[in-house]
């Protein structure tokens, strides 16, 4: 399925949650923190007031409660406004 975000929205594939701590303790699914990092997989065309800075392939940081979760063909994504992205990792 092809998803094209509208206006100033971006589609992000969240990074997988950590399975183990640095000390080697396995983290159960119920205790895992929601990932705050992911890869941009699609971007909208922007608005007349906001140019799109993010590009497909950018790795970004976003807030804990940013975006709306959606699942497509078994893969979980987040869709959010570009302004909800805190930083681009380089």
Swiss-Prot record:
CDD domains: cpn10. The keyword Chaperone applies. GO terms for biological process: chaperone cofactor-dependent protein refolding. Keywords: Chaperone, Cytoplasm. Signal peptide: none annotated. It is found in: Cytoplasm. PANTHER family: 10 KDA HEAT SHOCK PROTEIN, CO-CHAPERONIN GROES. This is Co-chaperonin GroES. It comes from Bacteroides thetaiotaomicron (strain ATCC 29148 / DSM 2079 / JCM 5827 / CCUG 10774 / NCTC 10582 / VPI-5482 / E50).
